[in-house]
Amino acid sequence: MNQKQSNLLTLATRLGVNILNIYDYQNKDSVIKCSCSSHGHIIENTVDYLLKTNFECIECMHLKAMDVTDTTPFFLSLDAASYVSGMSLFNKEGQLLGHKTFSIDKKKDFFERVEELKREIEKIVRENNIQCIILEDIQYQQNPVLFKKLAMLQGVLRYTIINELKVQLITAMADEWRAYNHIYGAKRQDQKNAAIERARAIFKDNIPEDESESIFLGYYGIYVYNNEPQEED
């Protein structure tokens, strides 16, 4: 065994994975087969991909996602837009409890749509006693009119969440939550498709794109929440 193979074996072991064919590792494109230490699930891909994803076991993620005992909502994740928004609920442990798409008639005035989305968020927060909302931040759009509308929507939602609902707010840029969830793609549609495929792999279900993205936005936001100091009650 050479040093490169030894280093990879050590890393995989530290991450809870057993490499079954370490001698096949020659370069980043080498395909290696592993088994997770928890349940023995087989993980097989290129070294490059496995390093990017920290040797994650999708089957273990599926088991965790399905093994929900606490059904009390804590987090609300919002991939918000004035027409179609993806929404997901999670318990305090970060397990998905539910998801939906909230659509508003495009014929309605912009501010009417904003008000409708605002009311829906208020309803969800109050009915479920939500303690933390995770909201995707905006980034500059080539279309200045669209960017202006998204900025106005963000302002209304942030004010509502912080000042009216008095709920903790976590925001995340799209590049941040996609990188955390290993969602890649050069084009926007590629990224959407990657989110859908990842959701299908974890939940064994066909989840629409806006809902899939709200789920992975939520996972990242929960990671941020768990790694920042929390105020004591």
Q: Predicted segment positions?
A:
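Phosphate- and other anionic-substrate recognition elements at nucleic-acid/protein interfaces
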Residues: 66-233
